[in-house]
Amino acid sequence: MRVKMPRVKAAQAGRQGPAKRHLAEQFAVGEIITDMAKKEWKVGLPIGQGGFGCIYLADMNSSGSVGSDAPCVVKVEPSDNGPLFTELKFYQRAAKPEQIQKWIRTHKLKYLGVPKYWGSGLHDKNGKSYRFMIMDRFGSDLQKIYEANAKKFSRKTVLQLSLRILDILEYIHEHEYVHGDIKASNLLLSYKNPDQVYLVDYGLAYRYCPEGVHKEYKEDPKRCHDGTIEFTSIDAHNGVAPSRRGDLEILGYCMIQWLTGHLPWEDNLKDPRYVRDSKIRYRENIASLMDKCFPEKNKPGEIAKYMETVKLLDYTEKPLYQNLRDILLQGLKAIGSKDDGKLDLSVVENGGLKAKTVTKRKKEIEESKESGVEDMECSNTQTEETIQTRSRTRKRVQK
C-alpha cells in the first residue's frame, strides 16, 4: 500500500529557510478518532511514515479491530504543520464521494481515478493537537512497475493509462485545480483492481481558476523550473503558475518516456535551462521530437498528433478533452486494439508480452493484498542518494 505524504516546495524552503515542523506522535492501534461530521474511525496498524506525519490503516468504528484488508488509511500530522492542511483543501473542494460519483454517472465512466475524501478533523493526544484525513487505500505505484518492466510499457498500456489520466485531468480542471506533477510515482493502482489507476499527491496542487476567474499569465523568476524537471511544462520552466495546458503537456512527456524509456533532455537534468530550451525547441518541431524518441519507422502517430494539439492551446484556454481522447483511441485502433479498460503493465518483447513479467506482476499484486504494507513510501527509509536527487530535481508549485 502506498500513500504519498505532501512535500514542501524545495525552492521556497531554500529562500526562506526550512520551516520548523514537528513529527507526529504514534497513535495506538484501536484508538478512536472523530471527524468533523462526528463520524468515528478506528486506527489500525501503522503502515508508513512521511517527513512529518504517519499513515495508518483505518476503518469505521466497530466492535472489531481494524483488519489488514481495511479499505481506508488515515494520514496524521501535527496541526501546526502545513502540507496536510493544503492537501485537505483540494479534497474538501473536489473529492467528496458524492461529487465523484455524480461525475462518473453523468460522464458514463466505469470509474474515476481521483482518491475519495472520507473525512477529516483534529484529534487531541497527550495535550497536543493533530490533523488527520481519511482517504482511500491504494496498491503499488506505477514507477515501481515501470522500473520492474525495464522502464518500458507497451503502446496499448500507455494509451489506456493516458485515457484514464485524461478523465482525471478533466475532472480536477473542472473543479478549478491543476495537478502540475503528473508522473508514474504519483499514479497508484487500486488496492482491489489492478486495472484501475489513481492520480495522487494533491498537497501542492494549484487552484488556477478560483471562483471561475483564471489566473493571468505572469512570469515569476522565483518560480522558474518548478515541478519534476524532466516532465514539467514550459510554462513552469518560465516561472508561470500551472494551468490546464501544462498538465496536458506533462502527460505528453510521460507517454513518450513510458514508451521509450527516456526523454531527449534526460542527459542533463542538472541544467534546468538546458531542459527548458530543449522542450521549447522540440515543441516548435514536433516531428524532430518524434524522430529523436522513435528512430524506427513505426512511429506512434497519435503521440505526435496529441503533442501538436496541446501546443496550440492558449494559457487560459479550456482543452477539448474528448478530442484528445479521440486521438488516443485512434492510436489503439491503429494497433488493432480498443479501449477495453485493461492495463497490461508488462513489457513488450519481440512483439509479444513477456509471460514471466505478467506472472510475476500477478504474484506481486496478491502479496500486496495480503500484507497491505508493500510499496509504502517512507521518507525515513529513503537512501541519502535518493533524497538528494529528489531535492535537486523535484520541486512543486505551492498554492
Task: Locate the predicted segments by residue.
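Conserved C-lobe activation region of Hanks-type protein kinase-like domains
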Residues: 192, 234-296
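ATP-binding glycine-rich loop module of kinase domains
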Residues: 56-100
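Juxta-kinase regulatory segment immediately upstream of eukaryotic protein kinase catalytic domains
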Residues: 2-38, 44-45
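Activation segment signature within eukaryotic-like protein kinase domains
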Residues: 161-162
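Conserved structural core of kinase catalytic domains
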Residues: 104-156
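Catalytic-loop of the protein kinase fold
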Residues: 173-191
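Protein kinase glycine-rich loop
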Residues: 44-50, 55
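Activation segment/activation loop of eukaryotic-type protein kinase catalytic domains
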Residues: 188-226
